[in-house]
Amino acid sequence: MAKLTYNIPKDYTVIDLETTGTSPAKSEIIEIACLKYRNGEQVEAIQQLVRPRRRISYFIQNFTGITNEMVADAPMIEEVLPAISACLQGETIVGHNVNFDMNFLKAQGVNFDGWYLDTLYLSRKLLKNVSCHKLEYLCDYFGIVDTHHRAASDCLMTNELMYRLASLPEYQKLSAM
């Protein structure tokens, strides 16, 4: 079973998925990104579009910017999972609402029982005066600029958000617990 931490890890992997919906039982992964960091420096990146079995809805195409044409020649999820599993093996996982991503990966047979840090949970603990804790709103709050709803850019923003949250005075109290 995965274990939540609030301590910023020295070595970690930031993950993000783009999917066709919110249910791992009914929806499919259409993009995966894993950015591996050592001592705060990115040392490895996997970004992969994934071809779903069903067409991507117009809503999801507009939301993610990922079209059916973009994934037409992409590998199926079964072809991508070995590299993703290897990238996550033994890592502390960082993500924004990372349980969402881990549940999709678990539904595909990727098991994870290490530590994870969720910037969504961390932001809710530290920014009680902020009403919305979605990644794009928190990035606006901290002045972090990038495109949204693509897996690799969301990983980069999540990584920066983690450090911005850790720089808050309230974080020192939380991490000491």
Stretches found by the model and what they are:
Residues 113-123:
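Short, acidic/small-residue loops that bind anionic groups at enzyme active sites
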Residues 1-115, 128-149:
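Conserved non-catalytic scaffold segment of RNase H-like nuclease domains
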Residues 153:
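Acidic donor-binding loop at a coil-to-helix junction in glycosyltransferase catalytic cores
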Residues 79-82, 156, 160:
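Short, contiguous clusters of charged residues that form electrostatic/catalytic patches at enzyme active sites
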Residues 1-7, 159-177:
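Acidic two-metal-ion nuclease catalytic site recognized across multiple nuclease folds
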